[in-house]
Amino acid sequence: MLYNRLYKDNDFLTPTTYTQELSEYAEQLSYEDIPPEVVERAKMILLQTIGAALAAKETPIAEKAVKMAREANGGPGGPATVWGMDEKMAAVNAALVLGTISDALDWEDCSWTGHPAAGVIPCAWLAAEEKHKSGKELITAIVAGYEVYQRIAMAVQPSDERWKTKGWGLTSWQIFACILPVAKIYGLDARKINQAIGMGCECSTLPVAYHATTMSDFYHYEHGYRARDGFLIAKSVEKGIHNQRDALDEPRCYTGVICGNDGSNGSA
C-alpha cells in the first residue's frame, strides 16, 4: 500500500515514494540479510566509537554533558549505561552524554557527509540495552541506521555555491543517524518509521555550521542533542503521533530547505 496521498487542503500529491522505500527497508532488514563483511565492519565501527567515547570521558566536554543529562534525569538511575562512568540514566538522557562524547575528540568515523557513528552507535546501543535486545539485533540496527542515514545525507547535499553562502548541515541530517537505530530496535513498522523520518525533518536544525567559524565546542554537544532527539522522536511515534509521513517526498519540506534545487536532491 502506498502511504503518500493527496493532501486535500492544498491539492498536493507527494510525487515520489522515497520515504516509504527507506522505511520499508529499515523495517524488513534482518541480520541474515547482512553480508559477513558488513557485519564485521559494523563491529569495528562499534568498537572504534566506544573507544573514542571512553577516551573523552574525562574531558570538560564530557563533564558538562553528564551534568546536563543528570539534571534532566532528576539524578542518577535508569536502564541505560553511560559508558565508562559507572552511572545509569534513562536512555534519552544517556544519549545526550554518549552522543556528545562519541564526537568530542573527533576520533569516530568520518563519512564525507559527517560523523554518523556519533548518532548510530550510541542510539543503537542504548536502545538495545533499554529493550534487552541481542547482539545480532544491535548489529542490524547499526546497519539500518547507516544505510538510511547515508542515503538521505547524500541526497540532500547542496551545491558548493549554496553551502558556502547558506551553510552546511552535517549536524542537521545527523538526526536520521539517531532516529533509525532506535526505531529499528523499538520494532516500529514501516508506517511508523516513515512518521519518525518526517518528524526528523521537522526537528532538524538549520544548516548553519556556525561552530566552524567560531571553533565553538558546541559542535560536539550538537551530536548529543541529535542523539537525545532521536530517542524522543522514536518514543513519540511509538506513542502515536501521526500524519507526518512522506516528508522526504515533499520538496517544500526538508530537501528544499537543505539543498534547494541545486543539490543532488533525491538522486541518491
Residue ranges and their predicted role:
Residues 2-267:
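N-terminal core-entry segment
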